[in-house]
Amino acid sequence: MNNSNEHRREEAGAANEQMPYNKAVKSAYADVLKDKMNREQEISLRAIKKGIYTDGGETDNYDMDKENDSAYEMFKKNLDFPLDQHNDDDDDDPYIEDNGQETDGYSDEDYTDEADKSFIEDSDSDSYDLESNSDFEENLESSGEAKKLKWRTYIFYGGLFFVFYFFGSFLMTTVKNNDLESHSSGATSSPGKSFSNLQKQVNHLYSELSKRDEKHSSELDKTVKIIVSQFEKNIKRLLPSNLVNFENDINSLTKQVETISTSMSELQRRNHKFTVENVTQWQDQLVKQLDTHLPQEIPVVINNSSSLLIIPELHNYLSALISDVIESPGIGTAGSAESRWEYDLNRYVKEILSNELQYIDKDYFIQEMNRRLQSNKQEIWEEITNRLETQQQQQQQQVQQDYSNVPQQYSSILMKRLIHQIYNSNQHQWEDDLDFATYVQGTKLLNHLTSPTWRQGSGVQPIELLTDSKQSSSTYWQCENEPGCSWAIRFKTPLYLTKISYMHGRFTNNLHIMNSAPRLISLYVKLSQTKEIKALQTLANQYGFGQHHKRDRNYIKIAKFEYRLTDSRIRQQMYLPPWFIQLKPLVRSIVFQVDENYGNKKFISLRKFIINGVTPQDLQIIENNEFPVLLGDTPEYGVTQNTDEGKRKVLLSKPPYASSSTSTKFHPASNVPSFGQDELDQ
């Protein structure tokens, strides 16, 4: 019996080892409570993720929770009641312990009052924070409050889930921000390294581009050299060996083509035959043009024979107008002059002083000219016909001429004569009139009207400006740059002024002479007869002049001149006003006043004034025709080449009124151009 009891107790112990109440109280309670909490958490998580809150789901969860609660209640009851209430018949027999005492078969020493007490104490001192759960357990004793506890549990775990969810998202955001800040701080912590890396990359790219450009340029240079060499080879093959002769041939052919084209164009324009009627039409057209463009008063020269002579400017104007009328393609629109005819009275001061320059009415001039053209119409027609025939013959001969010969060359003798003629022409432009601004002509300096000399200058006195030496190109008088630097002279014999000029050098390095050169020069004159001063002043006031000099009121301002350093002419003329020329006053002394220079504020540099004029004795000789006017060839200032070239021809047919400037229009020497350092003014 004892063996059977022991066997039964072993089976009961093995079967009851799996039950929570067969374990230690503390561990059993913790396992059951943990299992329940895990199941409730899994159920709430699945419900939140899937969003299943239907009635069926709530029912299932409620059944599962009910089963769990019943198991938990059973465990509690087993703890409160002894295990003697069972229907097993085998357990009715008392169990005899080793000590001889009888006990029930299912009694256990573990389930004593002390065990219950220890279970309660262990549950109160449990390490888990389950105070709320212990309260929850007490409330489960009543079945009416179980349902409320279930919903509170759901709300609690749902709130806990949301707290964990937001806390996790906050942690993730914080981590990301920390990563970004660490990244930015890491980026900003090493700006030098980033800049150096960028600089290295840029330098590398620049070096690559430079190498590429050098490579392309070298390849381009090689290609260009090859092309140029090939081009030179091809050109050398095409060009003849003697390039000079080839160039001469090309020039000759070009001239032939130009000549042929000119002759053809002229022949096309002149396709009509010259007749007397055409000449009459030209005459009528010429008269109309003269009537339109000529002024109302025509200046002419009347010599001793009372014959009318036109001045050279009018002669040139008529020649150009006649050529324009003849060469025009149509008669009706031919001969339109570009501008009105103008002339300069400064060229005819001598003729005005001798009363040879007079004015006639335009109608009388045109009538006289028309009468002479009418009487010589046949002669003009014959002359034109002969000239055209001669020109056509020359053109035909020129076209048929062989230009393959050696081009013509100038003779060395002809070249020497041409150079000699140019030299004489230039020299004669300087020597054709006396310079009265020299002390050798008796002119004296007026010290009381002359400005003081600049003390820090070269020491040249104003009297040096009266020297007659052409070698004194470096002689410059420097006066103080006071308001109006003056230089005054007095003639030995009163003069009729014909031309006044000033001469100043051109220097490349000595710029203090250039910026102190006079720019604006005023001319003051004192008349020989005091009774004419008032008339001169009244006339000058009408043209904006007539002011008195600040040091002497007897000197009257008649002109103002601007000397231009930009002009290549070193000798520039101070033109006399026409009203002064027509008044014909006799001048006793002159004052030149420099109103402005080219920028020097300390001093003004003056070199040379040239004054040309005629005396009353010269006019008397001209009026009486006591000495013939010498015209023709230019006088020889150098060595004569033969006796015939040095002769002066006396042209008695020419009127005695012509001056040197006027006579140069009638001989070839005046038309020869000047060159080099000998270039002088016209």
Swiss-Prot record:
Domain of life: Eukaryota
PTM annotation: Phosphorylation at Ser-189 and Ser-190 by CDC7 and CDC28 during meiosis regulates of the localization on nuclear envelope for meiotic chromosome motion and nuclear envelope remodeling.
Lumenal topology ranges: 176-682
Cystines in this chain: none
The keyword Transmembrane helix is annotated on this UniProt entry: yes
Outcome of mutating Q573L: Defective in spindle pole body duplication at 37 degrees Celsius
Annotated Acidic residues bias: 87-111
Known function: Component of the linker nucleocytoskeleton and cytoskeleton (LINC) complex that regulates telomere movement and meiotic recombination during meiosis. Connects the spindle pole body with the nuclear envelope through its interaction with MPS2 and mediates meiotic bouquet formation and rapid chromosome movements in meiotic prophase. Functions as an integral membrane anchor for telomeres and is a nuclear receptor for the SIR4 pathway of telomere tethering and gene inactivation. Essential for nuclear division and fusion and required for the first step of spindle pole body duplication in G1.
Protein name per UniProt: Spindle pole body assembly component MPS3
Organism of origin: Saccharomyces cerevisiae (strain ATCC 204508 / S288c)
